[in-house]
């Protein structure tokens, strides 16, 4: 039946016309450096490097790696753990953004790094966790690297293979900025490198899935990029093109640092941000209640409750989520919250109290239907009531459901009929405001960020048949929301006008 559960984690890898090879360069910092005192605008004005994109990754095992930090502050050092049979490889650090359409800038490169094949992974039988035990290949100093979302590109120098390693160079302060909050815990939950994820094991089902997964392994999806390219990079591109004051962090950092979001104008949760710890959620809610806006640009957000544990490489490198087997979790027996869905017991705390909407199921593929064209989020789109955009709702969706805790006033501005395995429901785009002045905007569809890429008759980089008309809508609405949220507490000038009585017959 339609309900919680998951398909393949993302669309097919993006088509590209970029060359597979790597441009020559010297070891160390490459290209013009941004002036660290003149802000992100100077970074965006620098020329980009379109050769970042991998078109031919080569065979499995040709080269792969991971970083021993999910994020670093500028100037910190991290380790790269790389396995390749090639005698040497090149590593290039690309900061992702707009860069006049190039979408990335080469910040640093090291050539002729000695290669070596690392040991085969093994599996912890107690939790079915894939462990590598790989040795550090290279220490990388990020001095001079601007804050941002990065892809490190590994190129075997014999031409046999290419892979990515994602990294966030995070912001020490978020005050006055819209915070791009990457979701590496969700990337890792879906990562099947080594044959196991939080969804599947060798049998392809839940019975043999991992109960814990670790960041001490490569990502198997999208040539090592995890879910970043489909669910996050298009938003980074748009936000940087708009020239907004941005900060960068991850959900893991938000969980670890209670004051990290102090003074932020907005927090941006991207296309697939499913796995949260209670600490991350509490800190985002505290920011909302202090006037920080929240944009949820996807669906299925904050559905799973997790715990972070260390590995030998450092803190918070294990994602624990026992799900239905929560009672077997030794951590829970020792007093930690159950690592299961937020909405179920013990300690049920439905995510709708933060999001306004709540995850309602998958799989769906449905048109997106505008119902409040006069809402400020639709300014400049020219849409009318009933305007429909095929395939924009999917594959997972959210709705307003007052059977769960729902903030009021809340305004549903798109109310899209869906049929999920025979069950009729709706996907809702909703906006609510709170006494602090903060506004919370939730799209209600997981395809929102990917649809930012939809251009031309074939949809361009977007998948699922999403066309340029949907792309134009999503780009304009997202720009409206980002600009409004970057300007300060949106509820002070754009209070939500509750319309649930008209939409759902709910008082």
Model-derived features with residue positions:
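C-terminal region of N-terminal signal peptides and the immediate post-cleavage residues
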Residues: 1-23, 27
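Proline/serine/threonine-rich low-complexity linkers at boundaries of modular beta-sandwich domains
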Residues: 40-62
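Ligand-binding face of N-terminal immunoglobulin V-set domains in extracellular IgSF glycoproteins
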Residues: 64-99, 104-169
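Aromatic-Pro/Gly-enriched surface loop or interdomain linker
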Residues: 84-89, 93-112, 159-260, 489-492, ...
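Helical hinge/lid and interdomain linker segments adjacent to catalytic or ligand-binding clefts
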Residues: 119-129, 137-140, 145, 224-310, ...
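Structural motif
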Residues: 151, 179, 265-270, 440-442
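Active-site-proximal beta-strand/loop segments in catalytic clefts of secreted hydrolases
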Residues: 155, 181-185, 249-253, 270-272, ...
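Long, C-terminal catalytic modules of enzymes
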Residues: 304-507
């Amino acid at each position: 039946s339609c309900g919680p559960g998951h398909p393949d984690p993302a669309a097919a890898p993006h088509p590209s016309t970029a060359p597979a090879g790597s441009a020559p360069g010297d070891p160390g910092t490459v290209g013009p450096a941004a002036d660290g005192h003149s802000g992100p605008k100077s970074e965006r004005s620098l020329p980009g490097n379109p050769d970042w994109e991998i078109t031919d990754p080569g065979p499995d095992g040709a080269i792969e790696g991971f970083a021993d930090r999910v994020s670093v502050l500028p100037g910190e050092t991290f380790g790269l753990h790389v396995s390749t049979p090639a005698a040497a490889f090149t590593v290039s650090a690309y900061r992702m953004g707009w860069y006049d359409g190039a979408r990335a800038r080469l910040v640093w490169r090291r050539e002729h790094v000695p290669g070596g094949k690392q040991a085969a992974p093994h599996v912890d039988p107690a939790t079915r966790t894939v462990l590598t035990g790989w040795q550090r290949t290279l220490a990388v100093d990020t001095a001079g690297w601007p804050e941002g979302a990065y892809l490190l590109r590994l190129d075997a120098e014999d031409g046999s293979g290419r892979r990515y390693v994602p990294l966030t160079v995070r912001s020490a302060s978020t005050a006055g900025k819209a915070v791009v909050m990457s979701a590496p815990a969700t990337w890792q939950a879906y990562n099947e490198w080594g044959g196991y994820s939080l969804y599947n094991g060798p049998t392809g089902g839940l019975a043999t899935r991992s109960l814990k997964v670790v960041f001490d392994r490569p990502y198997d999806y999208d040539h090592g990029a995890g879910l970043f390219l489909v669910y996050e990079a298009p938003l980074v591109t748009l936000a940087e093109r708009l020239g907004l004051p941005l900060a960068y962090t991850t959900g893991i950092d938000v969980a670890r640092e209670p004051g990290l979001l102090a003074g932020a104008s907005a927090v941006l949760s991207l296309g697939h941000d499913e796995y949260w710890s209670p600490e991350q959620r509490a800190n985002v809610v505290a920011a909302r209640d202090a006037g920080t806006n929240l944009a949820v640009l996807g669906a299925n957000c904050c559905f799973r409750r997790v715990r972070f544990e260390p590995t030998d490489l450092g803190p918070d490198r294990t994602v624990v989520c026992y799900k239905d087997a929560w009672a077997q979790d030794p951590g829970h027996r020792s007093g930690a919250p159950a690592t299961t869905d937020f909405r179920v017991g013990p300690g049920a705390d439905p995510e709708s109290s933060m999001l306004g909407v709540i995850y309602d199921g998958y799989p769906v593929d449905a048109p997106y239907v505008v119902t409040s064209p006069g809402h400020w989020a639709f300014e400049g789109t020219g849409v009318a009531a009933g305007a429909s955009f095929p395939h924009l709702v999917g594959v997972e969706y959210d709705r307003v459901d007052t059977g769960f805790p729902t903030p009021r006033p809340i305004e549903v501005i798109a109310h899209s009929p869906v049929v999920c395995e025979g069950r009729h429901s709706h996907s809702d785009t909703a906006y609510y405001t709170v006494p602090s002045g903060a506004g919370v905007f939730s799209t209600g569809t997981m395809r929102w960020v990917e649809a930012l890429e939809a251009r031309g008759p074939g949809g361009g980089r977007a998948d699922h048949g999403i066309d340029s008309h949907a792309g134009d809508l999503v780009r304009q609405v997202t720009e409206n929301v980002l600009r409004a949220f970057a300007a300060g507490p949106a509820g002070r000038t754009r209070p939500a006008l509750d319309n649930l009585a008209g939409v759902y017959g709910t008082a």
